[in-house]
A protein has these predicted regions:
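An aromatic- and glycine-enriched ligand-binding surface/loop that stacks and positions planar moieties
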Residues: 1-189
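Active-site beta-strand/loop architecture of penicillin-binding DD-peptidases
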Residues: 184-203
Length: 203
């Protein structure tokens, strides 16, 4: 009954819907929970009985005390986020030849700094052994920047529609987390790969 469905949706457009113009981040503030952009809005209340267990699973394990899992965004969907200037996103505009490389070869662009020199930003792990593992995996180290690999890939995400980094934890971005061992204290985390260890000054 596509014709009837179309008529129903047309009725929805007459119910006062309009775009929210206060900024994407503000859209999720309490005072805007039932703004005209919301359709079938469900309001959130800070009281027992109005939550759900999925809240414990958002983000990474260190984002919230008691987090049980990690959720990952689909990379094809993330690539649909446009550039800041409104142009369609294309990896080759930032890293020429990226799309012609195999997935394993181009994984080199996502690696942390210091794998050649051992002079990384963080941790005391064996950087050289991590490099060997990634070479065996198939990462093309001829494209690697020992100091600057992190910055190069971070800029790819920062030059996008700002809703991207407001929705996802992107490579080498920082975010606030509070592991269950911290007693409610907040720490700043950076998403790096390969993981080595936590800083001894933070959980």
């Amino acid at each position: 009954e596509y014709r009837l469905a179309e008529l129903d949706f047309k009725e929805v457009t007459k119910m006062g819907y309009s775009l929210f113009e206060g900024g994407y981040k503000q859209l999720f503030k309490e005072e805007n929970e039932q703004c005209p952009e919301m359709i079938f809005s469900i309001q959130c209340y800070e009281q027992d009985g109005y939550g759900h267990q999925m809240s414990f699973k958002y983000g990474s394990r260190v984002t919230y005390p008691g987090g049980w899992n990690d959720f990952y965004g689909d990379t094809d969907f993330i690539d649909t986020y446009e550039r800041k200037d409104g142009k369609p996103f294309n990896w080759d505009d930032y890293i020429p030849g990226y799309s012609k490389m195999s997935a394993k070869a181009r994984s080199v662009y996502f690696l942390r700094d210091g794998l050649n020199s051992g002079n990384g930003n963080f941790g005391s792990g064996n950087y050289r052994s991590l490099k060997t593992k990634m070479q065996d995996y198939g990462a093309d180290f001829s494209k690697y920047l020992d100091q600057g690999n992190e910055e190069r890939i971070r800029k790819v995400y920062e030059d996008r529609d700002p809703r991207l980094i407001q929705t996802y934890i992107t490579p080498y971005s920082e975010y606030i987390g509070s592991p269950y061992t911290a007693g409610g204290l907040e720490y700043t985390y950076t998403l790096r790969w390969p993981f080595i260890e936590n800083d001894i000054e933070a959980p």
